[in-house]
Amino acid sequence: MATKKRSASSSRWLQEHFSDKYVQQAQKKGLRSRAWFKLDEIQQSDKLFRPGMTVVDLGAAPGGWSQYVATQIGGKGRIIACDILPMDPMVGVDFLQGDFREPLVLQALLERVGEQKVQVVVSDMAPNMSGTPAVDIPKSMYLVELALDMCRDVLAPGGNFLVKVFQGEGFDEYLREIRSLFTKVKIRKPDASRARSREVYIVATGRKL
């Protein structure tokens, strides 16, 4: 019975995925993922990126966000990306494959960033989901805390932070923590984000000194 349930669930997901208008548009435009549209909507409202910026992209694979950011920061900008999964090379993107939770990977990422502070940190990281919130939410919150720690290390004063968060236990505390570090904080649910998903995006601008 369990196998049948998993099979039915997988079939529903595949049907939903391939009938999704954003998946279809991404395929037509040659984009790496539908996440491109989420970031485009956020950029239209919040103007996180400008030409020449240096951006850190956490949870980057397959590259939808890096692909979008590259169009906004131009040839003089720089993207340092990291993911546990592989990602095909992209012009203007310095990609590190590894588990961001491991100290050696984090150190390698910091070395790639170098001495200069960055203007934006974005995180689309998410754990492998089990479907059980009591298991998934703590794993997700651990990742977003690490992303915020990265901001503390590398984000310049006045810099911006965008992070995907799954609503649940720990969300309100995390939001308060971000508000203490940034001058303006908003919560976004882009149209391209599936309605049934717990995910929202916290947009934090103007890192405080």
UniProtKB/Swiss-Prot annotation:
Keyword S-adenosyl-L-methionine attributed: yes
Subcellular location(s) per record: Cytoplasm
Assigned EC number: 2.1.1.166
Q: What is this protein called?
A: Ribosomal RNA large subunit methyltransferase E
List the PANTHER family: RIBOSOMAL RNA METHYLTRANSFERASE, RRNA METHYLTRANSFERASE 2, MITOCHONDRIAL
The record lists S-adenosyl-L-methionine as bound by G63, W65, D83, D99, D124
Keywords associated with the record: Cytoplasm, Methyltransferase, rRNA processing, S-adenosyl-L-methionine, Transferase
Q: Which family does it belong to?
A: Belongs to the class I-like SAM-binding methyltransferase superfamily. RNA methyltransferase RlmE family.
Upper taxonomic lineage: Bacteria, Pseudomonadati, Pseudomonadota, Gammaproteobacteria, Enterobacterales
Instruction: Give Gene Ontology CC terms.
Output: cytoplasm
**What is an example of a GO molecular function annotated in this UniProt entry?**
rRNA (uridine-2'-O-)-methyltransferase activity
Q: Which Pfam families match?
A: FtsJ
The free-text function statement in the UniProt record for this protein reads: Specifically methylates the uridine in position 2552 of 23S rRNA at the 2'-O position of the ribose in the fully assembled 50S ribosomal subunit.
Q: What class of enzyme is it?
A: transferase
Q: What is annotated as the active site?
A: K164
